[in-house]
């Protein structure tokens, strides 16, 4: 593995390099990522009232996620946790600790073709992650961890280094490739093997072909095997458990369809709900395996979705799939970027040395903002490994917040830069404290950009644009947004003559 990473990088983080260590010396870490799972796609309530108490919403009554409930009781969940609005940018941000504007994978990666979209930046990073990105699994590997990737990768296009997670710093890759969605969830269909068609088949799971093993279960079984091997080798492990669920196609997991019979919901919405419950079963099975192996108290689980929800319950700018929030995956609204985030020890034990070193509040809700960029430094903090020298981070550790405390030093802003066409097109959104500005570039009419402003403390569901009434605040946030874009060396949309469209402020 080491020879696959640029040798010139070794000196950059030699302070983090160790020989293989014993499992008793470092905790195990599982990052459990669910594709296209939004904040509301669960029975665990993340919406809070003014006092920070959870408030159940109708969608929380629709979904069944008992193992997420189990995990939440054992740990802390964040009511306000931000991801990028689509998958590839989020996954790159998780792996690098950098915002999409900086790593420049600002759109989802279409495996075969550059999906820059008509006015997208010419030099956006379609090829995705490379071995020079210093993703944190590689840093962990150098510190003696066994690093395991199971499931969706979507780190790069076909033929790129990022198409195979083993090129980036994982010892083991099972089922990860350039594809962003499975051809099928059914083993009977070979998880998408279609003769003569572009392959969306999930690789490496041939042993389950022609069986009734649902994809989420196949991935869980493979993860269990790798955990067992790491335990036998007496090595601490990092598991990137990255489900293809709940991305389309919305195929029914027949084991759970009896739970979703609301005649007001369409068939696809019911199928989506079964994918959610099947994913939740995987979480429970994994937690049970950790208990069975006697390593649960030494294993931290970080659970999250990779972008806003995509439930087939409404459009990109309404209050359907993410209700009461507006929008869904790919949109500029809160429903497009807010995701579930839970951190817990797999078996809480106040006397455990790892848990003493990294305490996690139990059955708690953290209302302070976190982002996917914070995962990189947080994971390394759990492992007791230093961030590589000269590696730029846009996030910071969530250690104090995970312990249930407030962290005044933690950033209270989030920049979401999407210079492409999608459900929400050519926009930058910027949240600072309670205020959120959405700036729209206008490639076909470059002199007529426009913007919206929301006060999320008074209007969390983005129903009232107050830009005209709050011009001073709009201009203030615009200035902070531009400063952040420049700091991260962002690329911008272009017009029909390929001129870069930099943001400028127009008073209303």
Describe the residue ranges of each PLM region.
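Long, internal low-complexity/basic segments
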Residues: 24-27, 34, 39, 77, ...
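Loop/turn elements at helix/coil->beta-strand transitions in domains of secreted/extracellular proteins
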Residues: 25-30, 73-79, 142-148, 168-171, ...
């Amino acid at each position: 593995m080491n020879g696959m990473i640029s040798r010139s990088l070794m000196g950059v983080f030699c302070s983090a390099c160790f020989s293989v260590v014993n499992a008793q010396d470092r905790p195990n870490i599982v990052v459990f990522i669910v594709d296209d799972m939004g904040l509301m796609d669960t029975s665990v309530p993340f919406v809070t009232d003014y006092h920070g108490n959870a408030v159940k919403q109708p969608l929380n009554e629709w979904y069944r996620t008992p193992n997420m409930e189990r995990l939440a009781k054992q740990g802390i969940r964040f009511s306000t946790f931000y991801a990028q609005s689509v998958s590839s940018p989020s996954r790159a941000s998780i792996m690098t600790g950098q915002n999409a504007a900086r790593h420049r994978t600002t759109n989802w990666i279409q495996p075969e073709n550059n999906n820059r979209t008509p006015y997208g930046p010419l030099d956006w990073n379609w090829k995705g992650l490379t071995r020079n990105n210093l993703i944190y699994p590689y840093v962990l590997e150098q510190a003696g961890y066994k690093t395991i990737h199971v499931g969706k990768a979507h780190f790069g296009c076909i033929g790129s280094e990022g198409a195979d997670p083993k090129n980036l710093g994982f010892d083991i890759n099972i089922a990860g490739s350039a594809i962003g969605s499975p051809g099928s969830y059914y083993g009977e269909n070979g998880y998408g093997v279609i003769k003569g068609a572009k392959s969306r088949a999930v690789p490496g799971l041939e042993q389950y072909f022609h069986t009734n093993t649902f994809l989420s279960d196949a991935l869980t079984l493979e993860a269990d095997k790798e955990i067992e091997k790491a335990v036998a080798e007496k090595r601490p492990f990092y598991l990137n458990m990255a489900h293809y669920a709940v991305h389309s196609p919305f195929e029914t997991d027949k084991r759970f369809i009896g739970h979703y019979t609301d005649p007001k919901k369409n068939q696809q919405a019911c199928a989506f709900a079964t994918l959610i419950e099947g994913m939740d079963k995987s979480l429970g099975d994994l937690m049970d395996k950790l208990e069975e192996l006697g390593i649960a108290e030494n294993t931290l689980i970080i659970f999250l979705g990779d972008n806003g929800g995509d439930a087939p319950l409404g459009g990109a700018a309404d209050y359907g799939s993410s209700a009461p929030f507006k929008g869904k995956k790919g949109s500029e609204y809160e429903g497009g970027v807010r995701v579930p985030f839970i951190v817990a020890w797999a078996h809480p034990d106040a006397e455990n040395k790892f848990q003493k070193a990294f305490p996690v509040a139990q059955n708690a809700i953290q209302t302070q903002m976190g982002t996917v960029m914070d995962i990189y430094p947080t994971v390394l903090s759990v492992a007791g490994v230093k961030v590589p020298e000269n590696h730029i981070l846009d996030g910071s550790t969530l250690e104090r917040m995970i312990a249930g405390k407030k962290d005044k030093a933690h950033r209270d802003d989030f920049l979401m830069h999407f210079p492409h066409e999608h459900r929400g097109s050519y926009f930058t959104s910027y949240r600072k404290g309670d205020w959120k500005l959405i700036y729209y570039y206008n490639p076909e009419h470059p002199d007529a950009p426009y913007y919206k402003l929301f006060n999320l403390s008074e209007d969390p569901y983005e129903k009232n644009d107050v830009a005209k009434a709050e011009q001073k605040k709009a201009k203030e946030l615009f200035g902070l947004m531009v400063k952040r874009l420049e700091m991260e060396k962002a690329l911008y949309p272009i017009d029909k003559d390929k001129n870069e469209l930099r943001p400028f402020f127009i008073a209303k």
